[in-house]
Regions:
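Fold-independent oxyanion-binding glycine-rich loops
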Residues: 3-9, 22, 26, 74-75, ...
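Oxyanion-binding "anion nests"
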Residues: 58-60, 70-109, 113
Length: 204
């Protein structure tokens, strides 16, 4: 799916007055980009097979998963710095969309696994995860890193597990391409079957 098509509304359907658009993840991703000064816009170097990791309550599972809610999130490198500041309006957002519930999409760039855990702890203790219906976690730039027994998965599930909601990891967004079009603020229906992630956006 082309992100520009999503932004222009191409391929959307009207369902009883509500505009909807469904997007799917990809089969492969790139660990190392071929981008350089001579070739600033190369094709994706798709060398890795996508394998979604699914957790509920801290336990990994392999069942079909579905949940829905209002989608919000971003890069933890930035969000962690905003937590608890005058720019932190998450409490108001949570209250406004309490009936919908919240789906958090999160990814990281420069953070190592311990910094990811700290960012999750900060957001949790600030009340950001109130009304959470599920987590979508993109591939971190530190993919595959392990430090003192902590890896990218436990860095997240160690905090998210207590909410007993689905945590889908290694999703197709973040700093390791390709990325699914993410529409922050959209009401989103999430389905995970086998190794396929689909997001159905409802613009309402």
């Amino acid at each position: 799916v082309d992100t520009f098509d999503v932004l222009r509304g191409k391929g959307c359907k009207n369902n009883n007055g509500v505009v909807e658009k469904q997007v799917h993840g990809y089969d492969t991703w790139e660990r190392e980009s071929l981008k350089n000064e001579e070739n600033p816009a190369p094709q994706y170097n798709l060398t890795e097979k996508k394998i979604l990791r699914k957790y509920v309550g801290g336990d990994e599972c392999d069942t079909e998963i579905a949940f829905e809610g209002r989608l919000v999130g971003g890069c933890m490198d930035c969000l962690g710095n905003l937590t608890g500041t005058s720019f932190d309006k998450v409490k108001e957002f949570n209250e406004r969309y309490a009936a919908d519930g919240i789906i958090w999409f999160l990814e990281s760039c420069d953070l190592n696994v311990f910094a990811i855990r700290r960012a999750m702890w900060q957001m949790d203790n600030a009340g950001w995860f109130k009304n959470v219906k599920g987590f979508l976690i993109g591939r971190p730039l530190c993919y595959g890193q392990e430090m003192m027994g902590l890896d990218q998965y436990r860095a997240v599930t160690g905090i998210a597990a207590k909410y007993n909601v689905p945590v889908i990891m290694d999703c197709d967004f973040g700093h390791l391409s390709p990325s699914m079009p993410i529409v922050s603020g959209a009401y989103t229906q999430v389905k995970v079957k086998d190794n396929d992630l689909s997001l159905n956006y409802r613009f309402c």
